[in-house]
Swiss-Prot record:
Illness: Craniotubular dysplasia, Ikegawa type: An autosomal recessive, sclerosing bone disorder characterized by proportional or short-limbed short stature in association with macrocephaly, dolichocephaly, or prominent forehead. Radiography shows hyperostosis of the calvaria and skull base, with metadiaphyseal undermodeling of the long tubular bones and mild shortening and diaphyseal broadening of the short tubular bones. Affected individuals experience progressive vision loss in the first decade of life due to optic nerve compression, and deafness may develop in the second decade of life.
Subcellular localization(s) per the UniProt record: Nucleus outer membrane
Transmembrane segments: 171-191
GO cellular component, one term: nuclear outer membrane
Membrane topology, record value: Single-pass membrane protein
Biological process per Gene Ontology, one example term: regulation of nucleocytoplasmic transport
Stated role: Ensures normal bone formation, through the negative regulation of bone morphogenetic protein (BMP) signaling in osteoblast lineage cells by blocking cytoplasm-nucleus translocation of phosphorylated SMAD1/5/9 proteins.
Record-linked Gene3D superfamilies: alpha/beta hydrolase (3.40.50.1820)
The protein, known as: Transmembrane protein 53
InterPro entries on file: AB_hydrolase_fold, DUF829_TMEM53
Pfam families recorded: DUF829
Taxonomic classification: Eukaryota, Metazoa, Chordata, Craniata, Vertebrata
Amino acid sequence: MASAELDYTIEIPDQPCWSQKNSPSPGGKEAETRQPVVILLGWGGCKDKNLAKYSAIYHKRGCIVIRYTAPWHMVFFSESLGIPSLRVLAQKLLELLFDYEIEKEPLLFHVFSNGGVMLYRYVLELLQTRRFCRLRVVGTIFDSAPGDSNLVGALRALAAILERRAAMLRLLLLVAFALVVVLFHVLLAPITALFHTHFYDRLQDAGSRWPELYLYSRADEVVLARDIERMVEARLARRVLARSVDFVSSAHVSHLRDYPTYYTSLCVDFMRNCVRC
């Protein structure tokens, strides 16, 4: 079972989403409300207690919620080296749906920063395989993502993760990461492209057609607003129902903290619209 090998959290409401009922219809019959199973993919270095605040948005409304954050060393180093180790984690994550027998329920992804996007890109690829092609995704929310090759922003994010490490170790890891990025994605970019497609390019060309909501801020110093706006334009060009909301002043993955009511309403309205589609 994938659940034995993945450090995840699942919240199941007392009344599961597929068993909830609306008030009786005019004909006297109750109509079934199928809330989606929500999968939260955390940012690099994210703690489960951080994701729990977002999880509450959906759990309070009767959704089953799965929370997972990929290990930071895979996010920053494996992907930068072109090693698709996150694909294995993405497969285990999707296997959870079968373990809990919820694979027939609609799915909503809520993806945070590039750390979540790097994992999500493999989810998209796996959804094209025989094992997972019957899973029904109804929508995806992107929070502070995706960003395209912002080395300074990535170093800021990694520095925040390593904040409590020894100063010398922190410096060595930051230098190592910068060298890997420059070597594989600048100097050797044409060679790297032969065996590994950057996650940003993969998302731009993704064949998925469900609605997408991009929540970002021009004040974000980790993922640049222009990268997200360019992604939205690319998705619209592929006839995907993509919408974006600029929070203007909030920092990276801080939109819920700064605008809790507005952020929550955006997520809930998007979820409900996706389920009705």
